[in-house]
Amino acid sequence: MPRAVWNGVVLAEADSDAVRIVEGDVYFPPESVDHTYLRESRTRTVCPVKGVASYYDVVVDDEVNRDGAWFHAAPRPAAEGIAGYITFWKGVTIEQDD
């Protein structure tokens, strides 16, 4: 069961068959993410494969990981399976049970 962890807090956890892996990034279904640790960011980027990405700051115990998570609300057709799914980076570790 993959989970995203930052500063000792589990941010997301889902069954292996529920996550999506695209270009090496593990995308979690939105209902598997603890949104209490996410704060909307104004950052937007464009990926040629997936389209526009919107970001969240990850906030744990007043520590902020700026733009530490992102999602594609309306991805391009090649990546439509990740619409709304959330992935992490910038020190957020993805752990896997054996």
Q: Language-model features: where?
A:
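Terminal leader/tail segments of proteins
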Residues: 1-98
